[in-house]
Regions:
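Expand to "…catalyze enediolate/carbanion chemistry for C-C bond making/breaking, isomerization
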Residues: 1-141
């Protein structure tokens, strides 16, 4: 599933603003629909300003926050920017590994929640960490 922001804003006579706030509702609905349908995360809309890397990165981050798994690209220069946002960083991978390892150790002792580096960790956080590790494994191996 992919989101076409241009089609969406045309159909609803919206003005596609720089902060993309007019896209928030559709992004949320698509992300929910993909999840409810047990589909892969949807792919986010294009950015028309092909020479504006910062705008592209901001848009990609918004898409990622809404659960999108990637970004449609209309220019080759946008591909590495997409990877920059949607590929887990070394820090994210290290943190995810630490979360999973600490939780598995705690779970072996009968605990279903822990504190790690000042953060509460329970099953949803562990599952998210496992998802990050699986994504990193599939993209980086």
């Amino acid at each position: 599933m992919a989101f076409g922001g241009g089609d969406y804003t045309l159909d609803l006579n919206y003005e596609w603003n720089a902060d993309e706030s007019v896209l928030a509702y559709a992004r949320a609905k698509l992300s929910h629909a993909a999840r409810l349908g047990n589909l892969e995360p949807p792919i986010d809309t294009v950015v028309l300003q092909i020479k504006d890397d910062e705008r592209f990165l901001q848009s990609a981050r918004h898409g990622k926050q809404f659960g999108f798994g990637g970004k449609l690209c209309i220019h080759p220069a946008q591909i590495p920017l997409t990877h920059q946002v949607f590929t887990p960083s070394d820090e994210e991978i290290a943190h995810a590994r630490a979360v999973v390892a600490a939780f598995e150790a705690a779970e072996a002792e009968g605990s279903a929640s822990i504190q790690l580096d000042g953060y509460f960790i329970d099953y949803p956080i562990v599952y998210k960490s496992q998802r990050i590790l699986a994504l990193a494994d599939s993209l980086l191996s």
